[in-house]
């Protein structure tokens, strides 16, 4: 097994990434109807993609079939890397949809481990309450799911050590259960025969490298990292624009609040939970709770270590969240200069990662957004020339899943 560096050793010195620098093109969903991408946000120069907020819901289900495709790297493998997904929940299924739209992917998804069974897994892939119907041919077999003629084996085992990774010659396991998030747990996939593990959650402890695409993914090394984490959806939202602001203005300290849609970790009705606030009904309450996202930003932007903290407010919406960061900076500035720096990054080094909007939109308008973070420029504030407020939206499922696929492509591009 290759040496795996501690989480804290993985950091960024540049905002540019070989993968994200060309993410201006968009792939088409495999098997989905070709429609104009009317629900995507445009940059400030291009204007709004829809005439008004009332059109957003009508446009969404037709527009969700487009997504950012990563730029190809020069050292792409001659054969596709064999991928298995462990856990077929929200992120696992979103991963399949995102991956299916990549016409030039170096990954080949060959197996899914899901304890709900083939019938349920295929049904939930085909029909989704957030994304709508997956307009591809999804067929449930006896022990497989076929998507537009591509057959993916389905197994069911809760013990990673007993999964058939060796016999199936699995290269990368996308660990999407939310359970095996440390080196010991994720390492069981390697013991079972896989070569690498990509965790779709914040990694815990030593031996897991944390990467945020567009911020520090250029530091990934095939020889150095066996287990990597794609961090959290909120860290993926915060880290890109916080790096831009830190580079440009010098962040002294900051506090963040993410107003976050409810997740499967909460309770539909009041029921037991280790967090007594999360024990309360997600559909009826604003639920204050913890988030490690602010501190985790320092794992990929080390100049921000010890400078950020924050909380989460879980709200009764099923998807899309918004991050509000108030910070003190060392360089005097004003609103237009702050927005200018963010717009420049959105159109340049972080194109496809940061999106910039000057439209008065709401959360539903951002469903299906490919980018990790969408700057709401009209909400930017500057107080006394050194205190900033920046507000950024993010699709905590779809945008995050796009980055999981991107990070998988980074790993696959270095395969030996």
Curated annotation (Swiss-Prot):
- Reactions that this protein is recorded to catalyse: D-glyceraldehyde 3-phosphate + phosphate + NADP(+) = (2R)-3-phospho-glyceroyl phosphate + NADPH + H(+)
| Pathway terms, separated by semicolons | Carbohydrate biosynthesis; Calvin cycle
Q: Does the keyword Transit peptide apply?
A: yes
* TM regions (residue ranges): none
Q: Which residues form the active site?
A: 233 (nucleophile)
Segment annotated as transit peptide: 1-78
A GO cellular component annotated for this chain's UniProt record is: chloroplast
Q: Which domain of life is it from?
A: Eukaryota
Q: Gene3D superfamilies, alphabetically?
A: Dihydrodipicolinate Reductase, domain 2, NAD(P)-binding Rossmann-like Domain
As for family, the record states:
Belongs to the glyceraldehyde-3-phosphate dehydrogenase family.
Q: What is this protein called?
A: Glyceraldehyde-3-phosphate dehydrogenase, chloroplastic
Read off the lineage from the record.
Eukaryota, Rhodophyta, Florideophyceae, Rhodymeniophycidae, Gracilariales
